[in-house]
A protein has these predicted regions:
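Class I S-adenosyl-L-methionine
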Residues: 35-106
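Mixed-charge interfacial surface used for oligomerization/domain docking
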Residues: 3, 9-23, 28, 34, ...
Length: 282
């Protein structure tokens, strides 16, 4: 059976990783001179505390080549095919590290690397689809072919509570960040062609903003594939998350409504209170 591996930015829960037998290759997070592995020895809340204390965003970096080789080696030596997923190439060199690891192991013919052109559970949606195909005994080439067809149909967007973290990370300018704070503006960010672009702006308290964001998606949600939808957040009030879940359930579109918490890398750039709705369009 083909082994499915993703970098840590897919933001899948431990439960889903176990269910679909997915392995994770962590990106690295630098808090000053201390280096951590995303999802292993650092939490988003620790990152927020450090970022607020230091008034800067942590640096993040691609997985270490040695770690990628160590993760791939037992499967390669057993002759198994591997399909790997990386965050958008425009955001990290994670995919390049995976390809280099495959070359170093002399297994480039059996290890396929997919640039998700996405982030968070926008990647996770594709990873789960690949894992289901693997369980159905599809080959690596077949999985890659099907996933490449699905990639343009992934819909990933999120609404942020504060522009501070995007500003610290160079994703928006100081004027926009200041105006956002004063006017209580919350932009909707959409992932398109592997990059993040701002679209609609909402005003008000984040709890009502989140619901308006979700309700604005209703027309598009009705064109979604029914298998699953992700609610991924970086530390929202649980009451808000439950209201979103109830709304999606009432639409009666999806077989599964899956809640996940954004990992360290994604959280370090978007900040607390961010909520995303992610699905695959028909």
């Amino acid at each position: 059976m083909v082994k499915i591996i993703s970098d840590s930015t897919c933001d899948l829960s431990q439960e889903l990783l176990r269910k679909y037998e997915i392995d994770i290759l962590p990106l690295h997070i630098l808090l000053g001179d201390k280096e951590y592995e995303d999802g292993k020895n650092i939490t988003p809340d620790q990152i927020y505390a450090w970022s607020d204390a230091n008034k800067t965003t942590p640096k993040t970096s691609a997985p270490a080549l040695a770690d990628a080789m160590e993760l791939f080696r037992p499967y390669a030596e057993a002759g198994r095919e591997i399909v790997c997923f990386s965050i958008s190439a425009g955001m990290s060199t994670s995919g390049n590290v995976m390809r280099l690891a495959a070359e170093e192991l002399g297994a480039s013919d059996r290890i396929k690397v997919i640039d998700s052109a996405n982030l968070s559970t926008g990647i996770g949606l594709l990873v789960v689809e690949a894992a289901i195909m693997a369980k159905n005994n599809r080959t690596a080439s077949q999985i890659v072919s099907e996933i490449e067809k699905l990639k343009p149909n992934v819909r990933a967007s999120f609404v942020v509570d504060t522009l501070t973290y995007l500003y610290r990370g160079g994703r928006c300018n100081a004027v926009a960040a200041m105006a956002g704070g004063v006017l209580k503006l919350h932009p909707r960010i959409v992932v398109e062609d592997g990059a993040m672009n701002a679209s609609k702006k909402y005003r008000g308290k984040i709890a009502s903003v989140v619901m308006n964001y979700v309700k604005d998606m209703e027309k598009d949600l009705k064109k979604a594939r029914p298998e699953r939808v992700f609610i991924t957040h970086s530390g929202c009030e649980q009451e808000t998350v439950e209201k979103v879940r109830a709304y999606l359930k009432e639409l009666d579109i999806f077989d599964e409504i899956l809640e996940t918490r954004a990992g360290g890398v994604v959280s370090s750039h978007c900040g607390p209170g961010t909520l995303s709705i992610l699905y695959i369009a028909k």
